[in-house]
UniProtKB/Swiss-Prot annotation:
Assigned keywords, A-Z: Cytoplasm, Elongation factor, Protein biosynthesis
GO cellular component, one term: cytoplasm
Keyword Cytoplasm belongs to the record: yes
Its job: Associates with the EF-Tu.GDP complex and induces the exchange of GDP to GTP. It remains bound to the aminoacyl-tRNA.EF-Tu.GTP complex up to the GTP hydrolysis stage on the ribosome.
Name of the gene: tsf
Protein name: Elongation factor Ts
GO molecular function, one term: translation elongation factor activity
Length: 295
């Protein structure tokens, strides 16, 4: 049958695929719209598989809360440009809503779940890959809960390059919980307090500081006292409640939280791409790779 411009337009609107791809799909399927959609999906998924060796180290973090449940997730893309794409923004919101509603235990379980639209999460992401043209990866997520007497603090820095979700216990002051989240985004503490630091890590630091003091030629009788003082600074660097509060450096974070009649139950901080070794291709290689890929 003859393939009309209107048919091509309709298929483009339904799939977001390019004009020539849509025309080819309709020709191959004799104008059957549903089969043409399947054809493009299959083609898109094949493209996605080809991109599997790329490193998706850009992207965004996103936070969603609903009542006493909160979620933070990281969705990776290959370029910062795509992370600003409307399709990417829509996808991350859809994934957040699904994850918060279904509460899968991990990414693997999440990928196999069925979304409200009847598609598997993995399939839904692959369709977005076909439209957007980059590898997209649901890297990680965490679901946290609170009671009616607590508050979530949600903060996205630089539009989602860093995301922090806190739970303030014993206070419903969301502004205070967000202030703590902003501090965590800026300072990046490893632990809530000293109790969370392992004995092994403390002992290792103590040995390093002791050797440091001895190498400085300090008398052995004062080394132990010096080391304890320096350990205090070490704890300030890694423990949230021991740190000077960013919004008011005259008080510790612990004092700020206590001034709200609260305790900090926990926090999750995600920075996009942390721990991922991003491959750096030079421009000439990138052009050559594209030329080879189009053959």
């Amino acid at each position: 049958m003859a393939i009309t411009a209107q048919m091509v337009k309709e298929l483009r609107e339904k799939t977001g695929a390019g004009m020539m791809d849509c025309k080819k799909a309709l020709t191959e399927t004799n104008g059957d719209m549903e089969k043409a959609i399947d054809f493009l999906r299959e083609k898109g998924i094949a493209k996605a598989a080809k991109k599997a060796d790329r490193i998706a180290a850009e992207g965004l973090t996103f936070i969603e809360t609903n009542g006493n449940d909160g979620l933070i997730l990281e969705l990776n893309s290959e370029t910062d440009f795509v992370a600003k794409n409307e399709g990417f923004q829509t996808l991350i919101k859809e994934l957040a809503a699904h994850l918060l509603a279904k509460k899968p235990a991990n990414v693997e379980e999440a990928m196999a779940q069925t979304m409200e639209n009847g598609k598997k999460v993995e399939e839904h992401i692959n369709e977005a890959i076909a439209k957007i043209g980059e590898k997209l990866t649901l890297r990680r997520f965490e679901i946290v809960s609170k009671t009616d007497a607590d508050a979530f603090g949600a903060y996205l820095h630089m539009g989602g390059r860093i995301g922090v979700l806190t739970v303030l216990e014993g206070s419903t002051d969301e502004a205070a919980a967000k202030d703590v989240a902003m501090h965590i985004a800026a300072v990046n503490p490893k632990y809530i307090d000293r109790d969370a630091v392992t004995a092994e890590e403390v002992e290792h630091e103590r040995q390093v500081l002791t050797q440091q003091a001895l190498n400085e030629g300090k008398p052995e009788k004062i080394v132990a006292k010096m080391v304890e003082g320096r350990l205090g600074k070490f704890f300030e660097e890694i423990c949230l409640l021991d740190q000077a509060f960013v919004k008011n450096p005259d008080m510790k974070v612990r004092q700020f939280v206590e001034s709200k009649g609260a305790t900090l139950k926990g926090f999750v901080r995600y920075a996009v791409g942390e721990g991922i070794e991003k491959r750096e291709d030079n421009f000439a290689e990138e052009v050559m790779n594209q030329v080879k890929g189009s053959n």
